[in-house]
Amino acid sequence: MALLQIAEPGQSAAPHQHRLAVGIDLGTTNSLVAAVRSGETATLPDELGQHSLPSIVRYTQDSVEVGALAALSSAQDPQNTIVSVKRFMGRSLADIKAGEQSFPYEFAESENGLPLFVTPQGQVNPVQVSAEILRPLIARAEKTLGGELQGVVITVPAYFDDAQRQGTKDAAALLGVKVLRLLNEPTAAAIAYGLDSKQEGVIAIYDLGGGTFDISILRLNRGVFEVLATGGDSALGGDDFDHLLQAHMQQVWQLSDIDSQLSRQLLIESRRVKEALTDAAETEAKVILADGTELTQIVTKAEFDAMIAALVKKTIASCRRTLRDAGVTTDEVLETVMVGGSTRVPLVREQVEAFFGKPPLTSIDPDRVVAIGAAIQADILVGNKPESDLLLLDVIPLSLGIETMGGLVEKVVSRNTTIPVARAQEFTTFKDGQTAMAFHVVQGERELVADCRSLARFTLKGIPPLAAGAAHIRVTFQVDADGLLSVTAMEKSTGVQSSIQVKPSFGLSDTEIATMLKDSMKYAKDDIGRRMLAEQQVEAARVLESLHAALAKDGDLLNADERGQIDATMANVAQVAAGDDADAIKLAIEKLDEQTQDFAARRMDNSIRVAFKGQSIDNI
């Protein structure tokens, strides 16, 4: 029996109708397209029989070259040949320039600070470049399948933020293609293996591609895929192995001042050497300089292993952290799935096997497994499998919440909550007559806003001018299947509402996520103390403001001595609240409350007298 039928409304397929949909692995280094045909899932080759399309785009005066054709010209025209554009998606130009890696491109800056590539065809942004990579994949699929696609599932790294995910959707939109869903790459691999191998239990997905590393811990049970935790490094991949090899060759050949053309030639040779060392103990590296000089050197597997050992060790450290987040041990992991071309590197497989204590799964081509999983998901979403037994649950990496008085964070959606998800919480006004409320959406695990990441701000206006605490504002957080966040605030009595969709301009790297998680544990005790202090300070401010209003209205109910005692106690509360002793503030508030109980009773009696003045018993 189906646990969940994943299909858009109105998309249930008729028995005689097969809808066309594909899965696309939009990779940093290479991209693939796959489809389900006659019950079999496979990647689709081009006219030359090539399954993978190099994620490379070259702009010339008269044309746009994509894939292998662009790769052939990359060494001669590096400035106009854009490689690994995925690394630029959702990042600011300032962030790119501040990075350690240099690029041969000429950049311009958009109005919102995002990078623009200056090409012979004008300025283009990463979204447009990504669309050029998608274009031949879509065309290939429609030609192979014999019709127009009704939707695609595109995979993205698990740590892509909202801006990066939206950019990927926008790239497809430029081509008029409907995106059924964005799917995390490790999760796509889990779908491929889950259906083919019928695995149950805890599975680790080790995904080392050209530009990113993702580790996901999933629990598979009776066709249910639940992501327990995710981790990784959005700036670590096979490209980094290539750059280390390139630096090694430059050092051996004593090449100091090199132009962009030679740099690209060295990079291409580095990739060839890396691939050759997958099966050989050593190989010869060779480049030809502009003057015709031929340079050669022997690179051994041992040398290459030494170069990349630190990077591979970083991936294993991420695995260890993510297992801890998931609350499982290596002994509980039944299988480790290898994803991405860089997992072919022998040292990677050796270290993964040593860490998890068992050989990793490689029965599905690690270069194609993500596209295959995406194709399976696309086939379900487009309506071809109405009785699907596949339930997919992803998680959010960091808690989402709202700033409250005192700079505190009220978490609405907790970290590692499965998505899609909707959570709601009620808030109220702080002051009498308050007609608007500002909302600050934050992300993180700390107790104070200052220690969390700001996502967005918006304001709800039109709140009825009631007494403090009388208005009820319902705030709803909704995270869709693609990880995009919508926040809505609604005043319950009037229905007035305001909302915002969070699309950050700047990416959040896994390194920042790891740092935020570490800090939340490191400063947990201090944070609780700071929160308790802030809560008492807010309560003191609320009590004093309320009492000031009461005295202004009904102060004549007190004699001079009583008023003097209350004023003195109020002054003491204000003085203590300015300090850093939460317990002292609490005691001061309690003393003030005790001292003003008689005043509160008189106010109540007076209010009753005023309300019933001039009325007879029969009218009450």
Swiss-Prot record:
HAMAP family per UniProt: HscA
Gene3D superfamilies noted in UniProt: 1.20.1270.10, 3.30.420.40, Actin, Chain A, domain 4, Substrate Binding Domain Of DNAk, Chain A, domain 1
Function: Chaperone involved in the maturation of iron-sulfur cluster-containing proteins. Has a low intrinsic ATPase activity which is markedly stimulated by HscB.
PROSITE patterns on file: HSP70_1, HSP70_2
Family per record: Belongs to the heat shock protein 70 family.
Pfam families noted in UniProt: HSP70
One GO process term, biological-process aspect: iron-sulfur cluster assembly
Protein name in the entry: Chaperone protein HscA homolog
Residue ranges crossing the lipid bilayer per the database entry: none
Keywords from the UniProt entry: ATP-binding, Chaperone, Nucleotide-binding
One MF annotation (Gene Ontology) recorded for this entry: ATP binding
